[in-house]
């Protein structure tokens, strides 16, 4: 499964909030809800997050094998 834990950690380190994602990143509240629920998002969203935080994809998502 894909985990967004690295995103929340990156946001915490940089003092960002979900409001930051919406206003500066153009990420919708429904997309934020999907990420919080561990659901899939588009590659365009992942790209927008990488641009917003000037980071690598590994700072946004990670793969965790199903148990």
Language model: regions and residue ranges:
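Alpha-helical residues within the helix-turn-helix
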Residues: 12, 23, 51
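Short, basic-rich loop-to-helix N-cap that marks the start of a DNA-contacting helix
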Residues: 38-51
